[in-house]
Regions:
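Glycine-rich acetyl-CoA-binding "A-motif" of GNAT/NAT acetyltransferases
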Residues: 94-97, 158, 184
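Conserved GNAT acetyl-CoA-binding A-motif
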Residues: 141-151
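A short, well-structured alpha-helix characteristic of acyl/acetyltransferase catalytic modules
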Residues: 2-67, 71, 196-204
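Conserved catalytic-core motifs of GNAT/GCN5-like acyltransferases
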Residues: 149-152, 169-187
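Conserved acetyl-CoA-binding loop-helix of GNAT-fold acetyltransferases
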Residues: 118, 124-138, 160-165
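Short glycine/proline-centered loop/turn elements that form peptide/ligand docking sites
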Residues: 128, 132, 155-159, 176-181
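Acetyl-CoA-dependent GNAT
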Residues: 63-121, 193-194
C-alpha cells in the first residue's frame, strides 16, 4: 500500500481509506459524492449508451466503450489508493458527470485533477464550475495537498475559463501535442498551489 496521509484518511475499508463522509458538495439538488460499486450499472447506462461525441473529443478518449471496459475501469478506480473518484448527481438521481483527484503523491502532496459532464444539456449552467471549486477545496482542505494540476486542450476554451476562474494558472503549453480530427492542437498545462488557494478563499 502506498504512503497514506493519516490525518485525512480517517476510515479504513478493505484496502482503501475513506473520509468519514461520502458527500463533499450539495447545491440546488445536485450532489457530489464518492463513487460506489453499486453505481457502476447506472454510470454505464446513463452515460456510455452512447458516449457523447463531444465528451470524447474534449477528453481525448475513443468514442465507443464496451460495457466490460467501463465496468472494469470503474471498479478498478474504486480500489486505487491514489484516486478520489467523485460522481456528480442530478436532482433526479442520474449520474451526469464525474470529478476526479488522481495520481496523488502523498510525499510531494501533489495530484492531478480532471472533470467531465457527460450530457450536453447540463453544460453551460455553472455545474462544472461549482464541481471544480468543490473538488479543489476538498483537495486542499481535506487532503492537505500542496499542488493540484491539470491539462486542457486548446480547443476547449470553456473549460480553460472555468479553471482560470477556480484559480488555476497557466504554466506551460505542449505545442501541437495532440490531434483534433485531422489538425494538431496544443495541450495546456495548469495548476494551483495551496498558498494561491488560501488567498483566493480569503478574497471571496
Amino acid at each position: 500500500m502506498k504512503n497514506i496521509n493519516p490525518i485525512v484518511k480517517l476510515e479504513f475499508v478493505g484496502e482503501k481509506y475513506y473520509m468519514n463522509t461520502d458527500v463533499i458538495g450539495e447545491k440546488d439538488g445536485f450532489v457530489i459524492r464518492l463513487a460506489k460499486a453499486d453505481d457502476v450499472v447506472n454510470y454505464y447506462e446513463q452515460n456510455y449508451c452512447p458516449l457523447d461525441k463531444e465528451v470524447a473529443r474534449l477528453t481525448g478518449c475513443k468514442e465507443e466503450f464496451s460495457k466490460e471496459e467501463v465496468v472494469s475501469f470503474f471498479l478498478k478506480s474504486l480500489e486505487e489508493n491514489d484516486r478520489y473518484f467523485f460522481l456528480i448527481i442530478a436532482p433526479d438521481g442520474d449520474i451526469i458527470g464525474e470529478s476526479v483527484i488522481n495520481e496523488i503523491d502523498w510525499d510531494l502532496r501533489r495530484a492531478n485533477f480532471r472533470i467531465g459532464l457527460y450530457r450536453q444539456a447540463e453544460r453551460g449552467k455553472g455545474i462544472g464550475t461549482w464541481a471544480t471549486e468543490i473538488t479543489r477545496d476538498f483537495a486542499f482542505e481535506k487532503l492537505k495537498l500542496h499542488r493540484l494540476e491539470l491539462d486542457v486542450y486548446s480547443f476547449n476554451p470553456r473549460a480553460e475559463t472555468v479553471y482560470l476562474k477556480a484559480g488555476f494558472k497557466r504554466e506551460g503549453v505542449l505545442r501541437d501535442a495532440i490531434m483534433d480530427g485531422a489538425k494538431y492542437a496544443d495541450d495546456i498545462l495548469m495548476s494551483i498551489l495551496e498558498d494561491e488557494w488560501r488567498i483566493l478563499k480569503m478574497q471571496r
